[in-house]
Every structure is written in C-alpha cells, then in structure tokens.
Amino acid sequence: MLALLLTLAVPAEDLPARLRHLESAAAAWSPAPSPDGTRVAFLTTMFGGRQAASIALEGGYPTQLTDEPGGIAEIRYVPSEPRQLLVVALRDDRRRLLLMDEDGAPPAPLDAAAGDQFPGGFTRDGKKLFYVVRDGSKVSLRSIAMDTRKVSEVVPPPPAAGAQRAVGSLSLEDAFSGLFALGPLSPDGRSIVALVVRSGSEAVVLADLQAARAELLTPDKAARFRQPRFSPDGRTLYVLTDAGRSALGVDAITVQDRTRRTVYAPGNPLDAFAVSDDGHRLAVAVDSTGLDVFSLLDLPSLRVQPLAAPPAGALAGGIIWDRPGERLLFGWRLADDTTDIWQLRLGRGSPTRLTRSPRPALSRNAIPRPTLVRAGEAQAWLWRPPDLPKPRVAVLISETPTRPVFDKRIAALNFAGLAVLAVNGPGAQRAALAFLKAAEDLDPRDPLLLNPDGLPVEDPSKWSGVVNGPRKGQGGHELDPDDPDLRALVRYARRGGAL
C-alpha cells in the first residue's frame, strides 16, 4: 500500500525530460570475436556517436576503443594479433581504414590514398590484407603487408608472362565499378568476392588476384545478394539471395562451374546466416511475423538441431560463429529495451546478454510495445501512447519491413501523444489512410508521414507533414535515423507547438 501511495504521489515527468532520457539510451551491435576467443569487439553508442568498444567474452565492463568524430562503420580483429583491430572510420564522409590496438595507442591510417576504402579480408596467417580504394570512377584493388605496411596494387601480369584471359572475364575496374561490399577472401588466398550493382541489380563477382581479372558468378535477372561466405575448402560460396524466389534464402555456388543450388529457403525470409569454420553447421535467422527465430542445421544433411531461443526480438546486423564453433554472437533488438550484444553457447542453456546499454531513467514499462494489426492486405504494427483514447497518428513507411522493436523516433512520438502505424509494401500509403479512416480509436485528421528512405509520396495533400531521411531532397523535415533530433521531430509533429 505504501509503495502504491508513493507511486501515485510521483508527478508525471514532463516531455522534455522524457526525450532527454530517450536521447541518452544507447545501443550495441556488430560483434567481432577475437582470434583467441577471449574478447569480442563491437560497435556502440554507449560513449556518444558510433564508436568501437570491446568486452571480455565471459562478461565485464566494455572498454572504449575509438573516439572518431565521424564514427565507426566496421570493426574486426587482425587474425595474427589477438589485441590488434582493423576499423573503418568515417572521416570527411569517407570510409578510411585504420589499424589500432586495445592498449590505447592512437589508430594509424593504413593507406593515405584518397577515396573510400573497403576492407576485403586477411590471408589465413593474417600477414596480408586485401582492400579496395574507390575515388570517383577510379577503383583500385590493393594489398598491404601487415608487418612492413608495404602497399601493393593488384595488377595484371605482363604480356610476356603468357597468362591467358578467361573468356567473358572483366577488368577489375569494370567489375568493381558498382561495389558496395568486399570480401571474403578465399581460404587459399587466390581470389576475393565482391558484391556489386550492375544494370540496377545486385551481383556477385569473383576476382582472381593473380590474373587481376574478375568474373560474374550470378548473371541472373534482378535479385539481391548478401553475406557471401566460403566453405572451408573454398570450393563452395554460400550467399543470401532471393534469386528465383520471393524471399531471401541461402544458396550455394560451386566456384569451379558456377552452378547454384538452394541450400535452405523455408519460405519466410532469412535475415542472416553463418557457416561454422569446420563447414558442418549452418545457423540461420528466419523472419517470423517481424521477429527472428534461430535454427541450426547440419551440413549437408540439413538435419535440424535444437537451439535455445533468445527473448522475442530481431537481429541487429548478422550472426557470427566464434572460431571453435562453440557459440554464436549477434546484436539483438527488443520491443521494450536497448539493442545489445548477446551470445548463444551451444548446449549451455539460454542465450546470455554480454552488454547492457544504458537507458537512464527509462524503465521497460515506460516504452510502449506494438500491436500487430491489418491495414488492407498488409501486416502492420501500431504503437499507441498510453491513456489517450483517440490520438493523432504518424504513418511510417520504409523500403524494408518495419520490425516490432524499440525505436527512439517512435517512442518520442508516443511520449508526445501520437500513435505510430508502420505499414510496408506496395500501396502502403493508401492502406494506412484507409486504416485510419476506419479506426474508431484513432484520430484520422492531419496524419504525419514518416518516410526515412525517401519513397515517392503518392498524394502530399493527405499529410500534415513529411519527415524524410537526410539528403533525400523531398522537402518536409529531415531526420537522421542514426542520430535523430527527437525534440525537433516532436516540434514538427506538433506543427511547431512548444514542448
């Protein structure tokens, strides 16, 4: 009774304070285990901005590794040095490769060449790194010796060497012109994979490092290709793709003859997969009504093994095995809590949380959870502010399906008294407007459109305002999804009203 009276006596916190708490909430994602299996590096906003940190795999307090004003885009350990890391930092809006260690030494640039730098992969002994430098239309595939820091460009052998060009092969500059991801390196170190965009469609390219020529592995019609992984013997390349089907699944490409076969495509989209270092196990994350479900399969039999499930949520990025193949590491998003690094030890019970990102003065009960609804033929998610009988609505549309997980932008609008309806797919805007018109417990007047991906707005007159992502050039209000100005968002949603 005393606790109840004290609760009732506490005044409701004002909106500016709640938005401040939201802005202070952090996240952690993109785990990368160390070669010796003792630590895991990851990306986080615990220290302000997108920085790199590391933590002992058995638990502890995270150590901040970087302090880059532009933030960090990627991180991985150097295979030959357990405490040395390669990071991709954003400097002057360019991706730059830096080498650093966990002992606090300043990060050192690997290559002074201008342009964006894409890491591809280390040789097995960790003594050489392959990467691409792209500056405008110029693309250069390079390697660097980690001990001497000597940079070498991958170039074709001289004509006198007698090398024969493969029929249909491409120059590296042509093959990498639409590069958006590089790697992995083949186990024998003779070739490297690249993901590119050609003629408006994604494709997988395999580059021969000795001949400095490349070939298309996927000369198909429009499709997505993601997360390429070699088998331990280098004969097979696994890739996440929707080629020839409506949802993403795992295919295997035989490197020698370029044939492709389906390995696992259950019907529901796959968000990520990982092949163990011994090549005998395939871990997959399957989208089930917006939430991810893990499965573990033997290769090549595809016999399903039991796998403990983390709390209901969705992946933040991919999944990765540690080197012994004893545990899976992944970033995990929850509906009412921060995104953090989790580990799943095979045969050791439930997954455990490695990091606990701060959310000061923000209890889990204070974060509204979404409800699954139907907007026409589409599945939709509705976040409602508590204790408001008929709130105004903001409609969220995006290129990819919205997940029912904690989002600062949605929580800020809920705190400000707006409901958020997330609808995806063709006709999403019309379906959302029809849903609002039919809903008796929502105010259909003056809806706000949240359009972070800059999708075409079918009828601007139907919306009281439009919130776009940065540099989308469609007018309205711009909001950075990685570092949103929540107060500006709420002011715009309230049509300029004070907080």
Give the label of every model feature segment:
Residues 11-28:
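A short helix->beta-strand "capping" segment at the edge of beta-propeller domains
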Residues 320-499:
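Serine-hydrolase catalytic core recognition
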Residues 1-7:
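Bacterial N-terminal signal peptides
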Residues 32, 54, 99, 121, ...:
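Hydrophobic beta-strand positions
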Residues 56, 69, 101, 114, ...:
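Residues at the C-termini of beta-strands that transition into short coil/loop
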Residues 25-43, 69-88, 114-134, 138, ...:
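Conserved beta-propeller blade repeats
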Residues 11-16, 39, 43-64, 78-109, ...:
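Beta-propeller blade-edge and WD-like acidic-aromatic loop motif
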